[in-house]
Amino acid sequence: IRSLNNIGSVFRTADAFLIEKIYLCGITAIPPNKEINKTALGATETVNWKHYKTTLECIDDLKRSGYTICSIEQAERSTMLNDFAVEKDKKYALVFGNEVYGVEQEVINKSDRVIEIPQFGSKHSLNVSVTIGIVCWELVRK
């Protein structure tokens, strides 16, 4: 994620839904950062996080730890979010792409599932922090 405001919003959303940990990858800035703090409102202190040089390295570690990797992207093999069935005995790691390119194809290829938010307008694009809020709410609700 490139926008520092979006990163801060991700921390706030993660705090709201008691997300276990955020994995920041690649060019994504990390706390402490004044611009991140503007939207995080202290959530960088309440949510655990770790930075990885690459998303693929992160995915490999999460898979070794037993996580099901779910990329959130509009892709050929995606399942609509409203049709996605949460299995209570599984641990899920959600992968969100950056604001310009979304989730990289090689990351999608390594994912166990691809989930898409149904959209009806002409843009077929949501801000990444909005996407994270929608997906987290839907999965918690289920």
Regions found by a protein language model. Name each.
Residues I1-K142:
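Post-transcriptional modification and biogenesis factors for structured RNAs
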